[in-house]
């Protein structure tokens, strides 16, 4: 239970003699408006409660500084002479407690009276040992829980990264749609390892269109060759070579036909 909770609970029940908060010591030494948690000694818990901060990693020697930081918010109980001591930073609370105040200062202000009560409670060896053991136990539990959360965090991150790795591994091979395929075999391997150009395979549609064009005109202008190349998804070089080969074949066929006709005509001569 922190000192903030105790102070807020005491403010809810301002009448000290009518309501004693969990047997927290003598109510006569505490003002009605503000009940100091450091001057209350709990009979329920097995240690002297002096307003210590039960956070992780604090030692028993810093209880005095923690109780001072816990009492900074009530304005009516702080004096101008002790304000610089209460405005210390969190890093300064790890230092050993300051020197005790003189007896005149103890009798002067209620805050110094609470300091005296803290000193008396710290003077008890059994309560100090129980404080140190309880704070050590709490710090161990806190460290254990924090380490558990830190161990759970990498496991959850690994589980989250596993599906992402699977999702990134799936699209490694892009899907090829039909309109991405070429209608003819690629002729990029002209300068192959064997020095031979691969034979270009034309589709049935491409061969039919080229035969139609050759039937109308055996020679093509460059403009017409570009149009046919775009229409058949071929290059100008392929169109030119196909027409050259087709003309050579046509000449050969005509020569054989003429030779056969000549031979046949000579045989039927009288």
Curated annotation (Swiss-Prot):
Residues 124-136 have a biased composition (Low complexity). It comes from the Eukaryota. Residues 67-173 are annotated as: Disordered. Its main location: nucleus. GO terms for cellular component: nucleus. PROSITE patterns: ANTENNAPEDIA, HOMEOBOX_1, HOMEOBOX_2. Keywords: Developmental protein, DNA-binding, Homeobox, Nucleus, Transcription, Transcription regulation. Residues 74-88, 144-173 have a biased composition (Polar residues). Gene3D superfamilies: Homeodomain-like. A motif (Antp-type hexapeptide) lies at residues 176-181. It is found in: Nucleus. GO terms for biological process: anterior/posterior pattern specification; bronchiole development; cell migration; embryonic skeletal system morphogenesis; epithelial tube branching involved in lung morphogenesis; intestinal epithelial cell maturation; lung goblet cell differentiation; lung-associated mesenchyme development. One of its GO terms (molecular function) is DNA-binding transcription activator activity, RNA polymerase II-specific. InterPro entries: Antp_homeobox, HD, HD_metazoa, Homeobox_antennapedia, Homeobox_Antennapedia_CS, Homeobox_CS, Homeodomain-like_sf. It holds the Pfam family Homeodomain. Residues 195-254 bind DNA. Belongs to the Antp homeobox family. Sequence-specific transcription factor which is part of a developmental regulatory system that provides cells with specific positional identities on the anterior-posterior axis. Also binds to its own promoter. Binds specifically to the motif 5'-CYYNATTA[TG]Y-3'. This is Homeobox protein Hox-A5. It comes from Gallus gallus.
């Amino acid at each position: 239970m922190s000192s903030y909770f105790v102070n807020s609970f005491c403010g809810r029940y301002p009448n000290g003699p009518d309501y004693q908060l969990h047997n927290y010591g003598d109510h006569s030494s505490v003002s009605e408006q503000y009940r100091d948690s450091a001057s209350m000694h709990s009979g329920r818990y097995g240690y002297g409660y002096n307003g210590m901060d039960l956070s992780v990693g604090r030692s028993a020697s810093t209880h005095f500084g923690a109780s001072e930081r816990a009492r900074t918010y009530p304005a009516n109980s702080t004096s101008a002479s002790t304000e610089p001591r209460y405005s210390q930073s969190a890093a300064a609370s790890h230092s050993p407690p300051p020197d005790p105040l003189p007896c005149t200062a103890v009798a002067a202000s209620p805050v110094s009276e609470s300091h005296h009560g803290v000193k008396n409670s710290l003077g008890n060896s059994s309560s100090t040992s129980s404080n140190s053991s309880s704070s050590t136990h709490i710090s161990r539990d806190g460290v254990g829980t924090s380490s558990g959360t830190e161990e759970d965090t990498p496991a959850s991150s690994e589980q989250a990264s596993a599906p992402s790795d699977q999702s990134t591994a799936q699209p490694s091979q892009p899907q090829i749609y039909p309109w991405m395929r070429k209608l003819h075999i690629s002729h990029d391997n002209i300068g192959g390892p064997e020095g031979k150009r691969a034979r270009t395979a034309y589709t049935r549609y491409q061969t039919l269109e080229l035969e139609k064009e050759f039937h109308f005109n055996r020679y093509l202008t460059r403009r017409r060759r570009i149009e046919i190349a775009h229409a058949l998804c071929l290059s100008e070089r392929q169109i030119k070579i196909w027409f050259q080969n087709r003309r050579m074949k046509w000449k050969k066929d005509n020569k054989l036909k003429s030779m056969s006709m000549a031979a046949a005509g000579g045989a039927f001569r009288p």
